[in-house]
Amino acid sequence: MREDICSIPVNDVFMPKDGCPFCRMRDMLEDRMATYITGAAMMEPDVRVETNRLGFCTEHFNQILARGSRLSVALILESLLATVREEVFPQGKVPAKKIVAAAHARQEHCFICENIEKNTAHLLDSTLKLWQTDEEFRQLYSQQPYICLPHYGMVLEAAMKLPRKVFPLFCLLYTSPSPRD
């Protein structure tokens, strides 16, 4: 099996044959992002600007609280709360609609969720390229016990970009009887 910077994380996710590989991919990315944000990244100005702009969903905020050191969490919170205070509790006369929009916007974005989504797209592209070019990987892919329904839709949507001759072969994985049955 080919090993390069794009294939290694994909192969690592597909090697275990336990559950949905794309759920494992999401878990891996989530773990890496939570570790990253509570590590040295908290001192990088460009990362702090993004975390202040996007904030965190409740689930990822709780992960950061549980994982990070007190100092890293305190530094993240200090700048994030200052940004939230300016946007959601502005000084002076600000239309209520603008404040409501700012409060809602804070609930719609998450630094970790958006990075997971972006990185999942890259890893999914790598997965499909490996499936097209590497027979060993096709074998590994076909040995997965299942792909959960949310990820099944995501994978098929991405696979629709495959060449016309390849897409039906890829779909056969899901429509023909499995040797696991």
Predicted regions and their residues:
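Acidic (E/D-rich), amphipathic helical modules within compact regulatory domains
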Residues: 44-54, 58-91
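Cys/His-rich microdomains that often coordinate metals
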Residues: 27, 63-64, 117, 155
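Short recognition patches in nucleic-acid-associated and regulatory proteins
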Residues: 25-47, 117-138
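Conserved small/polar residues in nucleotide/adenosyl-binding loops
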Residues: 174-181
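Short cysteine-rich clusters marking metal-coordination/redox-active sites
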Residues: 20-23, 110-113
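Short metal-coordination and nucleic-acid-contact micro-motifs, chiefly zinc-binding Cys/His arrays
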Residues: 16, 53, 103-106, 141-144
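Short amphipathic alpha-helical linker/capping segments at the junctions of internal repeats
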Residues: 39-42, 72-87, 128-135, 162-173
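Short, recurring structural edge motifs at helix starts
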Residues: 5-11, 40-51, 95-101, 132-138
